Amino acid sequence: MSATAVHSLWTTASGVTSAAPGNSFTAPKIEYTQLMPVLIIVVAAVLGILVEAFVPRRARYHTQLFLTVVAVAGSFAAIVGLAAGGYGTTDAGIVAMGAIAIDGPTLFLQGTILLVAMVALFTFAERRLDPGSNGNRVDSFAAQAGSVPGGEGEKAAVRAGFTTTEVFPLLLFSVAGLLVFPAANDLLTLFIALEVFSLPLYLLCAVARRKRLMSQEAAVKYFLLGAFSSAFLLFGIALLYGYAGSLSYADIANVVDGSVLEIDPALADTMGNDALLLIGGAMILTGLLFKVGAVPFHMWTPDVYQGAPTPVTGFMAAATKVAAFGALLRLLYVALPGLAWDLRPVMWAVAIVTMLGGAIVAITQTDIKRLLAYSSIAHAGFILAGVIAASPEGISSVLFYLLAYSFVTVGAFAVVTLVRDAGGEATHLSKWAGLGRRSPLVAAVFAVFLLAFAGIPLTSGFSGKFAVFKAAAEGGAGALVVVGVLSSAVAAFFYIRVIVLMFFSEPKADGPTVAVPSPLTMTTIAVGVAVTLVLGLAPQYFLDLASQAGVFVR
């Protein structure tokens, strides 16, 4: 091509550009104030990576712990500031060019996630439970995550007292994704947030100090099944985009309602196709139900909960359920409210088999972590009853249940870390026989958590179940409530069985010991017990708070 031709093309292009100023690039509008809780966590996570690169190894633990505590506390303070400024009620809105919603459910769920992250963080930082080599204090994580289990590299790292302090920035990255997940206002943001919190969790599951092969197996299972569910979610997103011509929740809802104002010419043949809507919605629902651990998408839960480091299990069991149910609520109430009656039979079936399946299979478990895993599956079914209510009361009841369940879960897994034998944590139920005689306080605390799981009055579990069952009954799901009550009765059997085992069985001579933790784990357990009792004895303030927060912005 000649120089004259090139000049002509350049001149023509310049003329077109100058003649069409409306096509000029517009800088994105980012509301940094409303996004401050997430930004604080992301900045701290990046700083945590720099700490790993430049801070001497012996100083990393305290530096990372301080940085993580400050970041989580600062982010929670930002949440409180936004709530006080009315961003959860009167000033709620859509920010980041439509990608994120800042409203009552967002702030309530983000606050819950941050509180869970703080108490779980203390179990991450615990260094007094496992006897270290040469007097070194070690935590629950592998001395050198990249070494071969049982190899010379691992042995040398253990002798040197190394710890995997990378778990702190990984935790922060996961928290960042969890904060965005329930706030996502379009499908692309939803998928990105899912991957941001999932990838660090895959790594955290693989770095247990004891039983490393089981830990790595759990991580591989979680990764493979998680990738499979992400594929379902992504394919569903593609189908919904073909249906609506947009990834925005509001635009999708408009097309579902038949109030769309503009049709994308490139998607004229697919927009409004009900088959794309139903299949795409079902596939996205599948991806989210995998994250909450609902049947039949629950198969990863017992193996991962059992194999992962127990502090990671506690955090994952609580925080991911909070974020995933928040995302599920927003999808159903904001993007797909027009599909409520179409999805209702499916949601009913999933809730019923989840409640019954989790409760019945838990009876057969002999490992305390697997028992708690199936317990979490049953609780996912109870929470789905509130989701199915399809009412403001249903939303607020789910928010309250998630708050109550989270602290009970983290506290219960914190207690599990204390009961130990020569191989680490003693998770087989037979080893918990007579624990009430050997360590009455620890057994009593664990009994409180088990009674809360069972929904016994005066605990947070009773208040939460009463709220979701009441909302479901008022929403026309009375039969579902009956199934839920029956499932709760079945579940109460195996919870009480553990209590009987601890207090009314003879302790074995070679039974486990109860480690004396640092104030960090003591704080986690104490906070869990306090929240469990407060939400059980005086829940009204928190029920009102959840009710005020239970309004989605569109």
Curated annotation (Swiss-Prot):
GO terms for cellular component: plasma membrane. InterPro entries: NADH-Q_OxRdtase_suN/2, ND/Mrp_TM. One of its GO terms (biological process) is ATP synthesis coupled electron transport. It is a multi-pass membrane protein. It catalyses: a quinone + NADH + 5 H(+)(in) = a quinol + NAD(+) + 4 H(+)(out). NDH-1 is composed of 14 different subunits. Subunits NuoA, H, J, K, L, M, N constitute the membrane sector of the complex. This is NADH-quinone oxidoreductase subunit N 3. The gene is nuoN3.
